[in-house]
Amino acid sequence: MAVQKENDRELIVDEDTLSEVINESKSGSPAAGHAVSDYFGTDEIFSRVIASADEEFGKSKRLLYFSGVAAGLSIGLSFLARAAVAAEVMPDGSPLIANLIYPIGFMLIVLGRYQLFTENTLTPVTLVLTRIASVPMLLSNWGVVLAGNLTGALIIGLVMATSGVLEPEAAEVAASFGEHGLSLPWFSLFIKAIVAGWIVASMVWLVHAAQDTISRIVIVFSLMFLIPTADLFHCIIGSCEAFYAVFR
């Protein structure tokens, strides 16, 4: 509560009301930068990330694992869709057209709240940094989610390689994705994966800063499009591509 004096009288003003008044000028635009209400502050975003991490740690290992499997299957859709579109537009079309469909699996994961290992490099770590959770708990969480993601990637890679779901041209393109990753030196692949992981972690932070679904979709699309365009490798999609190349 804030106390103001007017004509020798004390007026008690509710802080929420005061903030609302400050936040609007006569033109309807914010009167001060720090009073813009449709932006979360850094502390608020961090608190939202912690809340999400706390929810993850509260889940059973079984639920966490199957959520990870769902994420692995969903992210395989990025691999499948990119290969199918690339086969249609190449060699005459630009690979950027196929890269536009790459974020689709990440959209499913973000909107469906599935557990993806690279997302978990940010959210659960916040609980360790704030000493709410221990390092062994973090490693256990990572292990369960990674196992689930790899299971999903293995399933989708095996199904795509053995079921004939892809046309011959698309199957060749899909195989080239996996072979390209397997042909790179391990250190180069490692660095590319780290950069891709950093992009995903940035996406997670910005998704928690967004206030509506449309904003989240735009964030996911804008950042995930960078991964194939910059020839980076996401560890789970890369695993799916490698499984496909091996089983084919």
Predicted region positions:
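Alpha-helical transmembrane segments and their helix-helix packing motifs
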Residues: 2-248
